[in-house]
Amino acid sequence: MSRIGKLPIKIADSVKVDIKDNFITVEGKRGKLSQEINSSIRVKIEDNNIIVERAFNDKQTRAFHGLYRSLIFNMVKGVSDGFSKSLTINGIGYRVEQQGNSLFFNLGYSTQFEYVIPEGINIRLDGNTKIAVEGIDKCRVGQVAAEIRSLKVPEPYKGKGIKYDNEVIRRKVGKSGVKK
């Protein structure tokens, strides 16, 4: 039995779960998420809990067991609480501006980068160097944060670039000049 897969998922009072065939829909105060489920996995609701079980015991199904339990848990948490990732821009003259549905980055290049915010994702700016990516789908929030970070990955010498708030940049020592 999968250690993660066997844990029940508690359904909050504000969350509504609907299971039809191999499709689960979770609806809450923040929105609605749907997920198709592999035919080797069974999902049922018992006593205000979601139970994920497997139909077979082969290696692939055991892997799916924990995966789908985690996906459903993230759906329930997302529609009730939501997810967020914070990023910080480090560097002289590096900044971000929001205009409508786009972010414009000045990252030390001669041109600005434009990033169009995808639907279902909210972005808050705190000043011009802090970015908060928020949404109900954990996967999409992480993907958008990774795309923004990839515009200017932090470099190891001065730490200039876009980094996650909890990320530690391993610094390197620069060249040491030889004295004669």
From Swiss-Prot:
One Gene Ontology CC term in the entry: cytosolic large ribosomal subunit
GO molecular function: rRNA binding; structural constituent of ribosome
Classification via Gene3D superfamilies: Ribosomal protein L6, alpha-beta domain
Alphabetical list of PROSITE patterns matching this protein: RIBOSOMAL_L6_1 (PS00525)
UniProt superkingdom: Bacteria
InterPro entries registered for this protein in UniProt: Ribosomal_uL6-like, Ribosomal_uL6-like_a/b-dom_sf, Ribosomal_uL6_a/b-dom, Ribosomal_uL6_bac-type, Ribosomal_uL6_CS
GO biological process terms on file: cytoplasmic translation
Keyword annotations of the record: Ribonucleoprotein, Ribosomal protein, RNA-binding, rRNA-binding
Assembly behavior: Part of the 50S ribosomal subunit.
Family matches, as PANTHER family: 60S/50S RIBOSOMAL PROTEIN L6/L9, LARGE RIBOSOMAL SUBUNIT PROTEIN UL6M
NCBIfam families xref list: L6_bact (TIGR03654)
Protein function: This protein binds to the 23S rRNA, and is important in its secondary structure. It is located near the subunit interface in the base of the L7/L12 stalk, and near the tRNA binding site of the peptidyltransferase center.
Name of the protein in its database record: Large ribosomal subunit protein uL6
